Amino acid sequence: MTPVVALVGRPNVGKSTLFNRLTRTRDALVADFPGLTRDRKYGQAKLGELEFIVVDTGGIDGTEEGIELKMAEQSLLAIEEADVVLFMVDARAGLTAADQAIAEHLRKTHKKVFLVANKTDGIDGDSAVSEFYGLALGEVYQMAAAHGRGVLSLLELALAPHLETLVDAATQETAQDEEEEDFDEEALLRMVAAGELDTKEDTKETPFADLPIKFAIVGRPNVGKSTLTNRMLGEDRVIVYDMPGTTRDSVYIPMERDEQKYVIIDTAGVRRRGKVHETVEKFSVIKTLKAIEDANVCLLVIDAQETITDQDLSILGFVLNTGRSVVLVVNKWDGLDQKVKEDVKNELDRRLGFIDFARVHFISALHGSGVGHLFESIQEAYQSATRRTSTAMLTRIMQMAQEDHQPPMVNGRRVKLKYAHAGGYNPPRIVIHGNQLNDLPDSYKRYLINYFRKSLKIMGTPVRVEFQESANPFEGKKNTLTLSQERQRKRLLKAKAKK
């Protein structure tokens, strides 16, 4: 489960500075959602290989009107759903009444809170932070967010349990990969040169084959997510089911269809069918982001009557950035006349042409039309994302791509692609080795991605292709001269000296 870190504190203590430092590898992901203040920020950050969501809660000032009145509803929700809370104070300004009011609220939440004294650069930090121990929140961690001092050590401490879980999972996956495929690079290159690649048993079932497919139904409020969830589950089912460990997260609902097990991750709060008429869905950005991270496949629900909005694109961008498979679901399709339907399809083609690999379904969640076909696309996307393909097959496809369209010339030399192998799954990641790959134009990279996608019949999931320069075996080595070459060199040097 992707951890969530909430940044809490009164204005101007450095929350935005820390937020920008943590999310430097990615832009802020979500903004302008209904019910959120304009300065609310949600972003994705990384600590090593651990991805986590960071939330700048903002809007907390703890004035005499009371912390409960001045804290926005979404800020309360962010703190409630966070795994870790970083309570930031200003070491230069000292302890204020606002800090005390916020601390009092945080103590009531029983959350794991780290008290962070920011702006300790250029001052005696130990003396400056001493008064903050009176907040009774334990150790006070010194930081200079503007310069990055103290940030890494604090994150490693705060996210230690999640890092341990990640290391354990990575160790198991590495061991499994080593068992499944261990190729000799030199032997492979000889086979490539001799045209002896064996592409039999080119694909194999993954260790995910027996696991249920987790899919998340995501989208803006009031596009019909709850209606679709209930329709997919069936009318007569008691549908509220919290699996262990999900009390603060979305509802996880196990189900089975045609002997295939699924888990629906519902972000809207699932209701009995009799209550589907309620117009306002409980909506949490954090729940949506965490559901996307945890899912294998995401069903992005779009309102046909409103077509594509910037909010839809924001959610879609997060899905693609996290590498999740996606199925586009255009809901409320019934009742539209033919002219409007054509306009909607044209708008989808115009604004979503960059994800032509995703299946698009036009449905009515309320009446059930088209809903049954969603399961076919979910399975297709999941199998495409998790199928394992041999090095021999990937290398052969790469060769065919070169035969159909040669790489360009760079500085008078043609870019050379040597071999390809799998670098990961969910999403599929292909690593290509060769020479001068750093000079390969983006247009040819896109060509290769599309060629692999078409050859492997990959639908519903992004494909990532990485390029690695092959090592030069002579780099850093001096050329050893033979005895006759050494004598000739000495004669030339002596003749040059006489001149």
Curated annotation (Swiss-Prot):
Molecular function GO labels: GTP binding; ribosome binding
Record's keyword terms, sorted: GTP-binding, Nucleotide-binding, Repeat, Ribosome biogenesis
Biological process per Gene Ontology, one example term: ribosome biogenesis
Lineage: superkingdom: Bacteria
InterPro entries given in the database record: G_ENGA, GTP-bd, GTPase_Der, KH_dom-like, KH_dom-like_a/b, P-loop_NTPase, Small_GTP-bd
KH-like domain residues: 387-471
SUPFAM superfamilies: P-loop containing nucleoside triphosphate hydrolases (SSF52540)
Residue span(s) of domain EngA-type G: 3-166, 213-386
CDD domains documented for this protein: EngA1 (cd01894), EngA2 (cd01895)
Positions of GTP 2 binding: 219-226, 266-270, 331-334
Annotated residues for binding of GTP 1: 9-16, 56-60, 118-121
Pfam family, one: KH_dom-like
Its job: GTPase that plays an essential role in the late steps of ribosome biogenesis.
Family note: Belongs to the TRAFAC class TrmE-Era-EngA-EngB-Septin-like GTPase superfamily. EngA (Der) GTPase family.
NCBIfam families documented for this protein: GTPase_EngA, small_GTP
HAMAP family: GTPase_Der
Quaternary context: Associates with the 50S ribosomal subunit.
Protein name according to UniProt: GTPase Der
